[in-house]
Regions:
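Flexible hinge/capping segments at coil-to-helix
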Residues: 50-66
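A ligand-binding cleft/hinge motif common to bilobed small-molecule-binding domains
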Residues: 23-32, 78, 96-100, 105-135
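Short helix-initiation/N-cap motifs at beta->coil->alpha
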Residues: 1-10, 54, 71-73, 87-101, ...
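Hydrophobic residues within well-ordered alpha-helices
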Residues: 12-13, 62, 99-100, 140, ...
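Periplasmic-binding protein-like
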Residues: 42-49, 111, 115-158, 176-180
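Ligand-binding cleft/hinge of the Venus flytrap
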Residues: 59, 72-92, 96, 118-123
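Ligand-binding clefts/hinges and TM-proximal coupling segments of bilobed small-molecule sensing domains
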Residues: 74-87, 126-129, 152-180
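Extracytoplasmic small-molecule ligand-binding "clamshell" domains
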Residues: 1-23, 163
Length: 180
């Protein structure tokens, strides 16, 4: 079921969905409200700019720069922490369109979202810059009461990692080997 990122935890808690599988960081704040599965990949946040950009090289360069980010994400929080003027959107696709149309100067996004977009035929006029900010690790989320589903997902993840399926899929979609 497609929905805005900032609506995922409320949708889970109200019973509209059973599981969040949406690149969510297992932060301490979120752990207060949901159960998380084991981390299924390590991620971080990166900056995407147009290839002709020669002024933004790191998060420190975002001060007073117009940055696109998905609403309700840690990416938006980090952009704000570095002093960016943040335009928040419901979907990352909107961020890419804003960057392409020059209505924002950069996009802050999950590293794997950027890798997927650029590796799978996204805009060839974009590039990533700087070192990513590492995240707490990406997990799926269930309600606090649904530890049975959490355990089933953990078991499935263990099996996918053990038989090599996880590594194969990760390389296919992100163009690189998974990190621990």
């Amino acid at each position: 079921k497609a929905m805005a990122f900032d609506g995922l935890i409320p949708a889970l808690q109200s019973g509209q969905i059973d599981l969040i599988a949406s690149g969510m960081d297992a932060t301490p704040e979120r752990r207060e409200h949901v159960n998380f599965t084991q981390t299924y990949f390590k991620d971080g946040y990166t900056i995407v700019v147009r290839k002709d950009n020669d002024t933004i090289h790191s998060f420190d360069d975002l001060k007073d720069i117009t940055v696109g980010a998905q609403m309700g994400t840690k990416a938006a929080d980090y952009a704000k922490q570095y002093g960016a003027v943040v335009k928040e959107f419901n979907q990352n696709d909107q961020c890419w369109m804003e960057l392409e149309s020059h209505t924002c100067d950069a996009v802050v996004v999950n590293r794997v979202v950027a890798l997927y977009f650029l590796n799978q035929g996204g805009n060839k006029a974009f590039k990533t810059v700087g070192e990513p900010i590492l995240s707490a690790g990406v997990s799926m989320a269930t309600t606090k009461e649904n530890s049975e589903l959490t355990a089933k997902v953990d078991k499935a993840l263990d099996e996918l990692k053990a038989d090599g399926t996880y590594a194969t899929l990760y390389k296919k979609w992100f163009g690189t080997e998974p990190t621990d």
